[in-house]
Amino acid sequence: MTKNKIGVFGANGRMGSALLEAASTKEHSELAAAYVRSSSPLLGINVNQLNSAADKTVTFSDEANITNVDVLIDFTLPAGMRTHLQTAVKQGVPMVIGTTGLNEADMTLLHEAANHIPIVFARNYSVGVNVLLNLVQTAATKFGDDMDIEIFEAHHRHKIDAPSGTALAIGEAIADAKGWDHDKVAVYDRSKVEQAKSQNEIGYSVLRGGDIVGEHTAYFATMGERLELTHKASSRMTFALGAIRAAGWLINKPAGLYDMQDVLDLK
């Protein structure tokens, strides 16, 4: 059986470590490369020393040297992703991207790169969250115009971007279902809104603390009842396994920009 050769950027990070394990243990994939910065003290060290599931022949290697991989996975910060994306295009290697906190210029780069290679970009790779995106759209279309919508998210103290990419994806899914322009209806700071809540708005609340992997709740509140749709992740392996699934799906796909909804056939 031919296995998909996976290369992981940011292999020494929290998500990178989970991706190394997932790539090493899934039946149809194998960890072919674990990339770190050229200044990393891990450079040249056998990955198996830190992750017993990894093949003993794989060492941490310089992210500038991409060889012998079928697909690349990147969950690093935006600055790193930009460099890695250029490398992937130059080498003609498909790429799975889970980086959050991207700006408009970054999204333009993604779209341009997708003219040359197949890319899966998703803010969350868990199956549950992607099912949630469908559920919130259904809920948004079933309630009347007097519905109030709020999104709450919680993550570990180290997460930089806020609201999370997943929270924004939930809000955008709801706005799309309602026919709203998300940028015009999103409210991120109510302390400066000196008036009652408008019905045509989506509010965001954020918590950062401890080691929370990720929690998201969409509230649909109207007079006399409230619907709460919640997803809680207890392990980063949830996202890592989803990314490995996306990587296997992406191989041999034509150039283009895909998302996890495509991978799971939820569209």
From Swiss-Prot:
The keyword Metal-binding does not apply. The keyword Acyltransferase does not apply. (S)-2,3,4,5-tetrahydrodipicolinate binds at H156, G165, T166. Coiled coil: none annotated. Keywords: Amino-acid biosynthesis, Cytoplasm, Diaminopimelate biosynthesis, Lysine biosynthesis, NAD, NADP, Oxidoreductase. One of its GO terms (cellular component) is cytosol. The active site is at H155, K159. InterPro entries: DapB_C (IPR022663), DapB_N (IPR000846), DapB_N_CS (IPR022664), DHDPR_bac (IPR023940), NAD(P)-bd_dom_sf (IPR036291). Its EC number is 1.17.1.8. It holds the Pfam family DapB_N. It comes from the Bacteria. It catalyses: (S)-2,3,4,5-tetrahydrodipicolinate + NAD(+) + H2O = (2S,4S)-4-hydroxy-2,3,4,5-tetrahydrodipicolinate + NADH + H(+); (S)-2,3,4,5-tetrahydrodipicolinate + NADP(+) + H2O = (2S,4S)-4-hydroxy-2,3,4,5-tetrahydrodipicolinate + NADPH + H(+). NADP(+) binds at R37. PROSITE patterns: DAPB (PS01298). Pathway: Amino-acid biosynthesis; L-lysine biosynthesis via DAP pathway; (S)-tetrahydrodipicolinate from L-aspartate: step 4/4. It is an enzyme of class 1 (oxidoreductase). NAD(+) binds at G10, A11, N12, G13, R14, M15, G98, T99, T100, A122, R123, N124, Y125. GO terms for molecular function: 4-hydroxy-tetrahydrodipicolinate reductase; NAD binding; NADP binding; oxidoreductase activity, acting on CH or CH2 groups, NAD or NADP as acceptor. It is found in: Cytoplasm. One of its GO terms (biological process) is lysine biosynthetic process via diaminopimelate. Catalyzes the conversion of 4-hydroxy-tetrahydrodipicolinate (HTPA) to tetrahydrodipicolinate. Belongs to the DapB family. HAMAP family: DapB. This is 4-hydroxy-tetrahydrodipicolinate reductase. It comes from Pseudoalteromonas translucida (strain TAC 125).
